[in-house]
Amino acid sequence: MTTTLPAATTTGSAAQRPPAAEPGSGTELERRIAQDPGSFRVLTGDRPTGPLHLGHYFGSLLNRVRLQNLGVDVIVLIPDYQVITDRDTAERLGEYTDGLLLDYLALGIDPARSTVFCHSAVPALNQLLLPFLSLVSVAELNRNPTVKDEIAHSRQSAVSGLMLTYPVHQAADILSCKGNLVPVGRDQAPHLEVTRTVARRFNERYGHVFPEPETLLSTAPLLLGTDGTKMSKSRANSVPLSATADETARLIKGATTDADRHITYDPDARPNVSSLVLLTALCLERDPHEVAAEIGDGGAAALKRTVTDAVNTRLAPFRARRAEYAKDLTYVRSVLRAGNERANALAEATLDQVREAMGAFR
């Protein structure tokens, strides 16, 4: 969690492993969720900077629907203000927001059980950023490894104050609705530690108001982009969920492989080939070693055909549902308006508690 950073990213081949059990399954936390799902509130989300892709699908989106269906209160944030943390303008914001809504609904996010909202529609959330900034030091923000990585890949010529304070804004996202469970990839865990620090320090200074959110670490395998680097919405190296079957075939055909014609699953020695094998295995819910063995000496061309067929078959029902929702954008946008109303009510109640706890703000 992001809540708000891309939820499925890759940092290298060593992270790729065979398909695992559902995120966090078998842990004490997962057992508590199963026993009493109604006691948990999840805050998660995606920045509207481009279409969601296969990395998001396997890395976080399926888990959101799973948690919703268990009975967890799932709140999905579209952090439109945070688009400008690492770029100077928010391009195509309305288009990308509509796209996220279509993806969420087509994937199974149910507006009757889950909430979707935007930053810009919830003033109380953003106001919480001010007292929260007093609870962390500049040195602590500078040391955050996720911020360092984002700064390194920023599109801006200079680091903005919004970029540096990004983890605190994320704390406001989570704590505005009293979120107590945040699904994150391992590369996002430092952000959640800032949220926990803010909650703990506020409670110590002003009295107990906030829960310290628990981390639900994703164990979902990580997929490389088609160029063999970190998969990203902004790097043109992903396969969007909304792509057509032909577009998917073209993107996968251009994926980086290697010169060895014999296909094997070896993430450390053959990261690019292994990522394609893994993607096939995830789509088919099979073991990647078996998938690789079946392709054998077929080479990269056979591998890419297999991947393309698996992806298009897996996403066909999603794409059909998405196309139906796209025919009624009035309804789709009404889902966001209703979510904004609920998020406003939650954030305003939290802000009232913060003001009361701080005493001087009446």
Predicted regions and their residues:
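Short, polar/flexible loop-turn hinges at active-site or ligand-entry regions and domain interfaces
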Residues: 90, 182-185, 263
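Conserved nucleotide- and phosphate/pyrophosphate-binding catalytic cores
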Residues: 190, 196-362
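N-terminal Rossmann-like or analogous alpha/beta NTP/dinucleotide-binding catalytic cores
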Residues: 2-171, 313, 323
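Classical nucleotidyltransferase
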Residues: 127-130, 143-206, 210-225, 233, ...
